[in-house]
Swiss-Prot record:
Residues 391-608 form the tr-type G domain. InterPro entries: EFTu-like_2 (IPR004161), EFTU-type (IPR029459), Hint_dom_C (IPR003586), Hint_dom_N (IPR003587), Hint_dom_sf (IPR036844), Homing_endonucl (IPR027434), INTEIN (IPR006142), Intein_C (IPR030934). This is Probable translation initiation factor IF-2. The keyword Nuclease applies. The keyword Translocase does not apply. CDD domains: aeIF5B_II, Hint, IF2_aeIF5B_IV, IF2_eIF5B. One of its GO terms (biological process) is intron homing. Transmembrane segments: none annotated. SUPFAM superfamilies: Hedgehog/intein (Hint) domain, Homing endonucleases, Initiation factor IF2/eIF5b, domain 3, P-loop containing nucleoside triphosphate hydrolases, Translation proteins. GTP binds at D464, T465, P466, G467, H468, N518, K519, I520, D521. The lineage of its organism: Archaea, Methanobacteriati, Methanobacteriota, Thermococci, Thermococcales. GO terms for cellular component: cytoplasm. Keywords: Autocatalytic cleavage, Endonuclease, GTP-binding, Hydrolase, Initiation factor, Intron homing, Nuclease, Nucleotide-binding, Protein biosynthesis, Protein splicing.
Length: 984
């Protein structure tokens, strides 16, 4: 039986850079030290994009941020941005800490999730990292110290601390042991141990300097204070006092200190406790527990509830225990004697033991790595000028000692905020969201009536690819998994590198798409009415706002034309098969979302009907979006099923790194409608079957080696299993390659990304030796090293959306193996090609400096042009063919050497080269006119075999016709003695 499935819609967009900071905000980079964002931008030389409003530069340096597990660590900062801004900025002052000024959209990690600066309130708590990373390379610092005339020893740094006689910026480039000596000197000289804290006069960057040791201090006007058990112990361990009285006072202070920082994360602890079977009464958590209390609570939660079995029995109705019934009712699990939705979900979690230490570890990491301080003041200011931003691999970084984040269209459709739901909110993977047709009708109802549209689809399945790189993972039988795509473009910023990359990928996969021109709300004077269709909202605007919108739309239309697309505003499109439809929207306020949904549904229905017809009962086929470990389930795969029906207990064949994996579905977990497949806990329904098109999490044994981007095929019979294995291995082997031929080594995060990178390289004629999925390893570097010995231009590694393992980084640096990593394919290849060109030019310059060019000269027959007969002989000559340079040896017609050209002169000027047709005077060392050389005689430049090979093999493009003639003439002379020259 065939039916129409819901279309799969991929949402692509460029990195959002409406979230920026003032130019004077500071960041710490181990390689550079403490710099302002403006200084960082100026240090980055390679321009990626530049226009009137913005400039993007490639950075590629390490910067402190927070990873997806909640750990403070060094992250790769890919780009630094500068954007023109006119309007409101938000200055956030943190109590006892620094302030930072950002655009209103810039989010902060708070005790209530990621919150935009414009929505922050006094009393909110925002995250401060417990440490920042500086330089630990002593050899590197020694060079810097030498340039600055500083001795790089602890004694000098201790004395500098006592007198503050050193540039403070140097301290962020100095290794920890020297910084420790500096701080010890400063605290010995100026520090006072009070009853509850250490106190010292404040200098500007002292709190950031202390963060290098995990010490969080407090700023009070012109004083800095260190208090709390954890901070005091870290101070004693890493800094301490040389002064014995102060050291003793510190020991006493620590012995009395019982508490460290307090953490306002009550709701997160309650959620975690409930997951492990604890009610709030059992845990009895105070409002803001201290670090010490929190650690005890987490240990208790990790051990699990001792009476979980009784609670399960109560929820299942097997026992009736009044006390438990009352408590579970208070927790919202039971209402009017029946299980609530939360109760049903939690019962499944408890029954299946879907929790383990990893859930606790995330919160523990947050507590170990971050401190939450209260917002003292939120101030709105007007600003005109450039604002700056940095793109890191997890889209967050530390500025002014505060964690800031860059983070959307699907959120508006879902009417949820995924980032706020995630405790860390720092993931950038593909997610899938099912939007039922009822929701589409609810959002776009008035428009559907107005347009007399009828939507027959069961719904829309959106796949959120936060970057174009994720789209390449959406593979289905060599094409794209997506039926349709939405390309999100900031109408104010226009095309970005990611936009261009996305267009190229959509073109390559032949995926039809519509354009969402986002952020119309930022057009000056735009009147906002939330969730209003664009066509109605546009009627509220004055002529100036409409004119600005039209100008920006025409700029976009012009850009699309450059890429070979006819485009127009959606309501002006005459033929949707020939023109791109652009829908002006505001994802933030929901304006235009109605038109976008109706357009997607209408186009899918009209033009993709045949593609959407599927055999419902047939075996399922799908594509892996992500492989991840889930508490209680082990390794799972997030899959988009695009054909057939998948059942619990079905045998499936999955693409693995080295082989096809055959396993049995143990559980199918389906996100609720409008929920996203990577949402946190309480999101999944356990189902017995799932029919295309749908996003589903599959739990099954042996999925550790499953490859993101590879196929999933249900195989009901042994014959079908073998057939599926063959098909999957064919697909993988067509992408993952390992050969002995000359070529570059490429790595990518998924099979689809690898395929896209391979295709681009092949189209450019760049050979590939090895293509594989995964991070760049030591083995990859060693292989590139062996290639380099044969052909240096291919002895490189190109990595797309992957990391470089530490040991690989060290060897590559030591051996000089170039590694190119990034998340824009065309930019990666451009970087590689630019490097090859630079290396070739460098090699050419080296060869040109060494090689001898061929030349033929004739001495003037007139004795008047003999200016000196010997020591050296100076004569007037004409260059007949080729060229001559000082240092070349001259030979006669019979091959006899006559001397070396010492210098070349034209009138009063000495020349480094003379070419065909030039008349010059040459000084010939070792020749006597009348004995060795004679007026009117022809002489030839003596070149070696190696010179001839170098010229013809490596420098052919710089040889002029005259050089080649000279080479042939000289070859004829030399061929009398050496047959090698006959071939020239």
């Amino acid at each position: 039986m065939k039916k129409i499935r819901q279309p799969i819609i991929a949402v692509l967009g460029h990195v959002d850079h409406g979230k920026c900071l003032l130019p004077e905000e500071k960041v710490v980079l181990p390689e550079i030290g403490l710099v302002t964002l403006r200084e960082l931008f100026e240090l980055a030389n390679e321009v990626v994009v530049k226009d009137e409003e913005k400039e993007v530069r490639k950075l590629g340096k390490m910067l402190t941020g927070v990873d997806e597990r909640g750990n403070v660590k060094l992250l790769n900062a890919l780009y630094v941005w500068r954007v023109a801004h006119k309007g409101e900025m938000i200055r956030v002052k943190v109590n006892g800490w620094y302030s930072v000024t950002v655009t209103p959209e810039h989010p902060f990690l708070t005790n209530r999730g990621w919150v935009k600066a414009g929505e922050l309130k006094e009393g909110d708590y925002i995250a401060i990292p417990r440490r920042v990373y500086g330089n630990e390379d002593l050899m590197k610092f020694s060079k810097i110290a030498k340039e600055l005339g500083i001795k790089g020893d602890e004694k000098e740094f201790y004395l500098a601390g006592a007198s503050l006689d050193i540039p403070i910026k140097v301290l962020f480039l100095a290794p920890s042991k020297l910084v420790s000596a500096f701080l010890r000197g400063y605290f010995d000289a100026k520090g006072v141990v009070r009853e509850n804290y250490i106190e010292v006069p404040l200098f500007e960057d002292l709190p950031l300097l202390l963060l290098r040791f995990g010490i969080v201090s407090r700023i009070e006007k012109s004083t800095l204070k260190i208090s709390g058990k954890r901070n005091l112990e870290l101070f004693r361990k890493h800094v301490g006092f040389t002064d014995s009285e102060k050291a003793k006072a510190l020991d006493e202070l620590i012995s009395k200190a019982k508490e460290s920082e307090r953490y306002p994360i009550l709701e997160e602890l309650r959620r975690l406790g409930l997951l492990f079977g604890f009610t709030r009464n059992e845990l009895r958590i105070e409002e803001n527990p201290t670090y010490e209390v929190l650690m005890e609570i987490l240990e208790r939660i990790e051990r699990g509830s001792p009476n979980l079995a009784e609670k399960i029995a109560v929820l299942e109705g097997r026992i009736k225990e009044e006390n438990y019934l009352r408590i579970l009712e208070e927790e919202g699990l039971i209402e009017n004697g029946k299980l609530t939705e939360l109760g049903k979900e939690l019962l499944e979690v408890w029954r299946n033991r879907e929790f383990d230490s990893k859930d606790v570890d995330y919160v523990r990491n947050i507590v170990e790595n971050l401190v939450f301080l209260p917002v003292e003041k939120v101030e709105r200011i007007e600003y005109e000028g450039y604002v700056y931003d940095v793109t890191t691999e997890t889209h967050n970084f530390v500025a002014n000692g505060i964690l800031v984040h860059n983070t959307t269209l699907l959120d508006r459709i879902r009417k949820t905020n995924v980032a706020a739901k995630e405790a860390g909110g720092i993931t950038q993977h593909i997610g899938a969201t099912e939007v039922p047709i009822d929701v589409v009708k609810e959002i776009a109802g008035p428009l559907i009536k107005l347009w007399k549209a009828e939507i027959k689809l069961p719904g829309l399945l959106f796949i959120d690819t936060p970057g174009h790189e994720a789209f390449t993972s959406l593979r289905a039988r060599g094409g794209s998994l997506a039926d349709l795509a939405v390309l999100v473009v900031d109408i104010n910023e226009g095309f970005q590198p990611q936009t261009i990359e996305s267009i190229e990928i959509l073109r390559r996969y032949k995926t039809p798409f519509v354009v969402a021109a986002n952020k119309i709300d930022r057009i000056k004077g735009w009147v906002i009415q939330e969730d209003e269709p664009f066509l109605l909202n546009s009627k509220r605007q004055d002529q100036r706002a409409i004119q600005e919108l039209e100008t920006k739309l025409w700029e976009l239309i012009g850009k699309f034309y450059e890429f070979g697309f006819q485009a127009n505003r959606f309501d002006r499109v005459q033929n949707f098969t020939r023109e791109l439809a652009i829908v002006p929207i505001s994802a933030k306020y929901g304006i235009g979302i109605a038109e976008l949904l109706v357009l997607i549904a209408g186009l899918s229905q009209k033009y993709l009907e045949e593609r959407l017809k599927i055999e419902v009962e047939g075996p399922a086929r799908g594509t892996i979006l992500e492989v991840r470990e889930e508490p209680g389930l082990g390794h799972t795969i997030d899959v988009i099923i695009y054909e057939g029906t998948l059942h619990k207990d079905d045998t499936i064949v999955v693409g693995g790194k080295d082989k096809a994996i055959v396993t049995k579905v143990r559980a199918l977990l389906k996100p609720k409608p409008l929920d996203e497949i990577r949402d946190p806990r309480f999101r999944f329904d356990y189902v017995d079957e799932v029919t295309a098109a749908a996003g589903v999490k599959i739990a099954a044994p042996g999925l550790e080696e499953a490859l993101a981007g590879s196929p999933v095929i249900a195989a009901p019979t042994p014959e079908a299993v073998e057939k599926a294995k063959e098909e999957i291995m064919r697909q993988i082997q067509s992408v993952v390659i390992s050969t002995d031929k000359m070529g570059v080594i490429i790595k990518a995060d998924t099979l689809g990304s690898l395929e896209a990178l391979s295709k681009e390289l092949q189209e450019k004629g760049i050979p590939i030796r090895k293509a594989d999925v995964g991070n760049i390893s030591k083995t990859d570097v060693m292989e590139a090293l062996s290639v380099r010995e044969e052909d240096p231009k291919y002895g490189v590694i190109i990595g797309f959306n992957v990391k470089v393992n530490e040991d690989a980084q060290e060897i590559a640096k030591a051996k000089g193996v170039p590694i190119f990593v990034g998340n824009i394919i065309y930019k990666l290849i451009e970087d590689y090609e630019a490097w090859v060109k630079e290396e070739e030019e460098k090699k050419k310059r080296e060869l040109l400096a060494k090689v001898t060019f061929p030349g033929v000269i004739r001495l003037y027959p007139d004795e008047r042009y003999v200016f000196r007969r010997s020591n050296p002989a100076i004569v007037g000559i004409e260059v007949i063919e080729g060229r001559i340079k000082p240092g070349v040896t001259l030979i006669k017609q019979n091959g006899q050497k006559v001397g070396t050209i010492k210098s070349i002169k034209s009138r009063d000027e000495f020349l480094q080269e003379a070419k065909k047709g030039q008349a010059v005077a040459v000084a010939i060392e070792g020749a006597i006119v009348g004995r060795h050389i004679h007026p009117g005689e022809t002489l030839y430049v003596d070149i070696s075999r190696d010179d001839a090979i170098t010229l013809l093999k490596y420098l052919r493009d710089v040889l002029e016709d005259s050089d080649i003639k000279a080479l042939k003439i000289i070859a004829q002379i030399k061929a009398k003695e050496d047959p090698f020259w006959r071939a020239i």
